[in-house]
Amino acid sequence: MVQKKKFCPRLLDYLVIVGARHPSSDSVAQTPELLRRYPLEDHTEFPLPPDVVFFCQPEGCLSVRQRRMSLRDDTSFVFTLTDKDTGVTRYGICVNFYRSFQKRISKEKGEGGAGSRGKEGTHATCASEEGGTESSESGSSLQPLSADSTPDVNQSPRGKRRAKAGSRSRNSTLTSLCVLSHYPFFSTFRECLYTLKRLVDCCSERLLGKKLGIPRGVQRDTMWRIFTGSLLVEEKSSALLHDLREIEAWIYRLLRSPVPVSGQKRVDIEVLPQELQPALTFALPDPSRFTLVDFPLHLPLELLGVDACLQVLTCILLEHKVVLQSRDYNALSMSVMAFVAMIYPLEYMFPVIPLLPTCMASAEQLLLAPTPYIIGVPASFFLYKLDFKMPDDVWLVDLDSNRVIAPTNAEVLPILPEPESLELKKHLKQALASMSLNTQPILNLEKFHEGQEIPLLLGRPSNDLQSTPSTEFNPLIYGNDVDSVDVATRVAMVRFFNSANVLQGFQMHTRTLRLFPRPVVAFQAGSFLASRPRQTPFAEKLARTQAVEYFGEWILNPTNYAFQRIHNNMFDPALIGDKPKWYAHQLQPIHYRVYDSNSQLAEALSVPPERDSDSEPTDDSGSDSMDYDDSSSSYSSLGDFVSEMMKCDINGDTPNVDPLTHAALGDASEVEIDELQNQKEAEEPGPDSENSQENPPLRSSSSTTASSSPSTVIHGANSEPADSTEMDDKAAVGVSKPLPSVPPSIGKSNVDRRQAEIGEGSVRRRIYDNPYFEPQYGFPPEEDEDEQGESYTPRFSQHVSGNRAQKLLRPNSLRLASDSDAESDSRASSPNSTVSNTSTEGFGGIMSFASSLYRNHSTSFSLSNLTLPTKGAREKATPFPSLKVFGLNTLMEIVTEAGPGSGEGNRRALVDQKSSVIKHSPTVKREPPSPQGRSSNSSENQQFLKEVVHSVLDGQGVGWLNMKKVRRLLESEQLRVFVLSKLNRMVQSEDDARQDIIPDVEISRKVYKGMLDLLKCTVLSLEQSYAHAGLGGMASIFGLLEIAQTHYYSKEPDKRKRSPTESVNTPVGKDPGLAGRGDPKAMAQLRVPQLGPRAPSATGKGPKELDTRSLKEENFIASIELWNKHQEVKKQKALEKQRPEVIKPVFDLGETEEKKSQISADSGVSLTSSSQRTDQDSVIGVSPAVMIRSSSQDSEVSTVVSNSSGETLGADSDLSSNAGDGPGGEGSVHLASSRGTLSDSEIETNSATSTIFGKAHSLKPSIKEKLAGSPIRTSEDVSQRVYLYEGLLGRDKGSMWDQLEDAAMETFSISKERSTLWDQMQFWEDAFLDAVMLEREGMGMDQGPQEMIDRYLSLGEHDRKRLEDDEDRLLATLLHNLISYMLLMKVNKNDIRKKVRRLMGKSHIGLVYSQQINEVLDQLANLNGRDLSIWSSGSRHMKKQTFVVHAGTDTNGDIFFMEVCDDCVVLRSNIGTVYERWWYEKLINMTYCPKTKVLCLWRRNGSETQLNKFYTKKCRELYYCVKDSMERAAARQQSIKPGPELGGEFPVQDLKTGEGGLLQVTLEGINLKFMHNQVFIELNHIKKCNTVRGVFVLEEFVPEIKEVVSHKYKTPMAHEICYSVLCLFSYVAAVHSSEEDLRTPPRPVSS
């Protein structure tokens, strides 16, 4: 999940004993019962599930004849229990064995039948065992079921005991020891259970072994009968009872074991004396390694073979239902968990049940679930459930016969893509084959892992362990042990998922919609599939699965980073392996003793029992189900056994447990168990995320509180008492911070290092590291790199500086080539798209780019595009690369050249560029040019387009000769954004960009023609992008439509002068019909017009000049009078249909809207008079004065947004497209509509005005009122305006010259008709998702999502709500603008409703904003074209300033860019990467010195207060800039943040006198209260305060002696005191700002 799994403070939750309290020799199976449980009380969050008894004994409590005990008498397996509400998984580790019970009357009946069935039942339950205590569950030895199958006594460790047991004639009953835990330490938990069994056995032998005439096995089982409650304790000796109490004390101490901390602490638990058994190590890997898989992951590969295994994996990945069955519980559950683990980094999103008990009532109903699942069932399951019919969509995998059985109605599984599948099979087969390689003289690999002595290795010198032959070795494999094979298997799977035809480049096709309260990510499957080099059905189906969809969310804040290391060609198990042997030596040890050295059990354990340890495996890898012949899966004998089970009448319902029946012999409170005083602190991750991330790892052992109990000892290697508290504090807060990865050079020394740590006196020495080959070459091999390069990520260099975590030296930039043209200028037209690599290990990219993207690094850097992890993320050693791109009005407009060939010309060209939304890789792979060539081409392309834009703005047009090249270049999304940002005259000034509504912009007729040509070229390029599934991004459509809606030219000013009532500069309020309606403020605005931006002065026109036509153009216009009349007939007919309802004049608001200033913001009054007739009016006819409101709200960030109304003029095809928009062809009336505007209050209060509005218009004010009450447009005579969007719809044919010119331009495929692109709903969705990403980047919402999420979780409820509201507003703004644009381009309104509602649901917008959008959709039938105003984007209102600073107090320090944002101060490196981010809530104090030009910032860093000094020439400006920004941030919050109150009281000890007392921080100063005296230090006498190793140092200026006196107080709250004093200084400085000259604040320093 995205959220980290909840920490569990218990290593073990429960230890239970399951069996039959009164076993019966007559029946094969009985209902299992809970015989004993520890502890007796349920845990609050996890009560003991009653049905655990069925999971321990899935086929019931079996009874068998003793002669069948020639089979192994104890087995182990694993099951899981998943909470259906929380989804939390607990693991059950179970050891099953048979204990004897004596028959009072010998019964021969059924010996042939029942005994035979018992034989089968024995195997069904017991024929598997997990071996390998340290590294894997691979010790299971499955004996064949044939009658003549007898184990090889010479090879079996239990041979002697089995041989002796063969002739005994007693019955035995199945008994289970089970541990339930949140942690998957399968092998070590199993070892604990075997040790418990050994303790009980040894006690029995010691106490009763000297009695003659009693078989030794009966003695041992007598102890078990007492232990399980079958015999009364009073019947036995007190010595026996004493031993049992000691055993229970051992169990209670085991249950109190401390918990290891991932990447920080390991727990070494002594379950037996050191001379008998080495301590068991419990350790969890840090997030940069694979998650712990404590079982043989390769087991399914062995059982099924590689091909069948991949077939099952395909079923799982494509969300089919899969059921596995086997007689071997262990192989069954391990295989299920292995399949789930093998799909990493994907996560299986549906139910997983490794073992579903046969005897549990109604268990078969789970197989009827409609969702996919993976369930493992015993082989007897379907035979026992007679009435159950298997669903016909379930794939059945028989592990015993190695078959995959397809369901009856199964669809054909798509084959895995080539060549990836061939590569995967090769790697998997190599991994399996490596176990049989004779590269090292190891007789028994599993024993080697268990730490046993290996005779052939004992005589060899230690350095020979690392000397390996160089032949017959694959680069993927670093050893022939099962653990390395498992790592190699997982690496092969990760590499498969990261291949070009599977999921490579995945994150480039995701769009983050929101981060709070939980991440929501949209996956653009269409563009993703289009980017695959080879289209395959497998990739198509995989892209539609929930696992891939969730992967996009998980990858924002991943809980594990091993896949990133693998992408970066790290395959060494020492670096990414999950087993403790590879990293335990790096962790701080916590020693915990379960065994009491004073216990009398030592006497029993001192004599080894007459058998080898039950825990020893007999084979070297996994379950040897591979040894089965075909008869092992014959169900004839199994069917007989199941029929016997059915006769036994097992009660499979959840039992009602009587607590008294399984009460412990002793009380847990009587057990001497030391409470680990600091354990909870050491275990639980610190609540402060920064705290837990930024503290250094504890590589060396630190001292912890020593145990006071002789039975439990906790100690560390470091015994220095002075630092113990501080070290513990660091350990407590550094939980989630992983250790830096081990350099490859450490690999060879691991063996010796671990051997040095292991005591020489150990009977069984644990060797943590198997000798493995040094990774001297990467993967893929060097010689194959060229041909395989397309599929793999680049290797980025790593640099280690001192003791700090490794930091990445970032590549200059990874730029994407345009995917639509093969020419070099088009290929290199993505100059500013950069890959942000947050890796400290040098990772290339998440599911990284194809080689065509990474072979050549760009030489350009945009600081706004680059992000590095904050210090916490870097120290966390959790690299997470992501692609950061920004659009218009981005975070910083600083662009620097960082590579070869960077010249001044290139730099200047790049400065003007805004980067784009491009995240997609090209479909066509081609050899990219060199970095220098790409930079040169990119700069040339930008310069060319800049010249074209300037030519257009100068009125000279695009030029026919340039048209083809312009079209080709605009196929790059980056260059589209670049051109549109230059064309948009609305965003040229800072003030204009921050207006709530986007005013219209007047341009000349010549500029209009040139801009229209450019916009049409852009539309054509967007059509090309959409044809390629949106590769490259399409957010530029928002910018295009904003320009099309706001830019216009005015026609025939000379004709307008003839209009009797035309008064361009006359305020509307002066009209007699509107007298008294304009308020004074509005009238003032009208008298002082605020003109909108105009075309550049190069056009030769002043701001008030209007464009005029030449006489030749007038002649052309006169020559098409007949055409005008033809259009007039159509318009008149359409208008008459709607006239009875409401009459709407022609065009929308226009230029005089700006000339009359922002009327809409205040009065909103505007009138279009019927007498204001112009050319257009003569075509349409007379219209009465009409006033109409249009809404407006925020618009979009880096994308430009437009809002226009009006349908196509005189185009029959366009009229027909409105058929479904409203009754009676309502849309057609807008062909003759003119737009006026009133404020809501005026409409409500003025009766004369309200009567003008028809039925439809009475609804519109209510919409505008609720749509954030935004200002509305002003109205005037806009009939003379021609907007650019009309040209996009084919409506601007004003002259024959225009038609001739358009006909000529069609040579270049610039269509004069409406594009069909506007009717593609997928286009609008993709454009919206791209625009959201662009806006989020512009707002800084996606810079380091991990840090953003951590900060959100650390904030109070009010601040969380504010962040959620910011994201809601962003999404609602873009959705609103999307509706506006779709209306503008005449999209079918039903389609608009469906698409917007779907996007609204996908975005998870909050109730307030979703209600506003829904109201717009409800009134959609009454809205057309420009009725819906544009909401201004949030990024346009952001104000960011950047300062160049030097770290330290002079210019010798490193150069950084300090960026002052709304919520934080961002410190960027000289190449633009984010180095630090300081949220304002973490800043405590800030001062500056104008003389030294040094700015001092104090901030809260975890539990410490940290001082940072920066030198800058603009020190004063920077100080006030930060101060103003912090004040604005504080004003937004409207509530006090949760945190420490001002002042406080702290316990201290005076180091001079040793006296203890209280230190009080007050507004007046510091008050010190001791037993015999009291001291008060005034605030203005405090010169300095700091902390040194838990000591608070205070320097006081004493006026009487005119000296500075130092006070030192020892306190565990030194940092809190320093923080409180600093807060006090800040408060006093703010309150008494006018007295700053008289009272100089101190300059405290925190060490």
From Swiss-Prot:
A GO CC term assigned to this protein in UniProt: cytosol
Annotated GO MF terms: death receptor binding; guanyl-nucleotide exchange factor activity; protein kinase activator activity
Biased composition (Polar residues): 142-157, 689-699, 790-804, 932-941, 1158-1173, 1189-1207, 1234-1243
Comp. bias (Acidic residues): 615-630
Comp. bias regions, Basic and acidic residues: 108-122, 750-768
PANTHER family to which the protein is assigned, alphabetical: MAP KINASE-ACTIVATING DEATH DOMAIN PROTEIN (PTHR13008:SF7), MAP-KINASE ACTIVATING DEATH DOMAIN PROTEIN MADD /DENN/AEX-3 C.ELEGANS (PTHR13008)
Assembly description: Interacts (via death domain) with TNFRSF1A (via death domain). Interacts with PIDD1. Interacts with YWHAZ. Interacts (via death domain) with KIF1B; links the motor KIF1B to Rab3-carrying vesicles in anterograde synaptic vesicle transport. Interacts with KIF1A. Interacts (via uDENN domain) with RAB3A, RAB3B, RAB3C and RAB3D; the GTP-bound form of the Rab proteins is preferred for interaction.
Protein name: MAP kinase-activating death domain protein
Species of origin: Homo sapiens
Gene expressing this chain: MADD
